[in-house]
Amino acid sequence: YLVNGGKSCMAGFVLKNTLSDNGGVTRGICKMDENGNLTEVVETKNIVKTATGAEADGKVIDVDSLVSMNMWGLTPDFLDVLEEGFKEFFEKEVPDNPLKAEYLIPIFIGELLEQGKMSVKVLRTNDTWYGMTYHEDVVAVKDSFKKMLENGVYKADLFSDL
């Protein structure tokens, strides 16, 4: 997308491909316009698998929703914008809480979207997200990566072709 002139994009994972069998997870559910541009990311906590799909705190969640796993495609120009935002963040947020203040890129991008200063194309992926939210997730993730190695998806020496 970026090599063809796009400015900003984000991988949109299908929610059902990002859930843990071992408990609730937090996911950023994407809202988009009719052209597939990101309009908002709604951080949703404690999303759990159910017999019929998924829910968060008793509310049914569409398992086909696209979610952000913070895989952004950004151009070098974005670094200038990011730096300006960081200066403002450092002046306003750090003095109040110097040990815990965090400059979160998704929050910053959300502010830019709200202000109309940025657009982000959501690129749907049907791939599985291999997360390890719970200790019990480790075995399944290891098994999945072992299978991908056996099937040639990845090489044992991941960077051998660089």
What does each model-identified segment do?
Residues 41, 81-82, 141:
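Residues that scaffold the ATP/ADP-binding catalytic core of kinase and kinase-like folds
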Residues 76-77, 136:
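Alpha-helix/helix-capping structural signal
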Residues 117-119, 126-162:
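Hydrophobic helical membrane-anchoring modules
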Residues 1-72, 76:
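Conserved core of the sugar-phosphate nucleotidyltransferase
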Residues 54-60, 110-125:
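Glycine-rich loop/turn
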Residues 83-118:
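A C-terminal functional module that forms or caps the active site or interfaces directly
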Residues 71-72, 102, 131:
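Residues that recognize and position ribonucleotide moieties
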